[in-house]
Amino acid sequence: GRVFIDATYEGDLAAAAGAEYRVGREGQAEFNEPRAGRLYTHWVGAVGEGSTGLADNAVQAYNYRLCLTDVPGDVIPVARPEHYDSTEFLSLAEDVRLGRTTAEDTVAGYYKGIRQISSMVALPNGRYDGNNHHLAFLSTDLPEENWPWPTSGWDWRDMYARRLRSYTLGLLWFVQNDKSLPESFRTECLRWGMARTEYADNGHFPREVYVREGRRVVGEYLFTAHDAL
């Protein structure tokens, strides 16, 4: 046909066609946006230490959206990944012990177990959509390592996808087996696994990285904070 629409996360076709695009965060000065650029806040609290308001190439962290279940007979147990490194997850043990979350105040009824590291949204047939948990300091997101993704080739993207898969399975293995965590916590997590009939041709693991943000093609108008206020 005469027209091609690039509706992908990455925008590779748009870039190959020469379309102008942006990656990362604009600085505060470019559009006079007080909350733009590199900022650290505790939810909607005051701007924290290390904030500069400057532009950077940071994009929102990626993860895998898991299909998890605790239905007996449908659970595929999590296997220890080949490149497992428990030191990546040790801070989680202290978070669990202290009941520490990203919220400024204590979260009433904060669930101890799989729901402390994964946001669990119910699906049909006893399955759950396991996503990164916004209240967890350590969850299924792998921040910063994904920053090259938008402008990299598929060799790098495939390498990162393997790394992210190993990290994700390593996290699940850690919460189910590492003795730095309370036995009750590990026992609850051990109930869960991948759904037997999902992604059976890929080790019951999702095929695609959840790419939340990539290139942003520059169009006729650029929406800024001033349009939303």
What is each stretch, according to the model?
Residues 1-3, 7-229:
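Flavin (FAD/FMN)-binding glycine-rich loop and adjacent Rossmann-like elements that form
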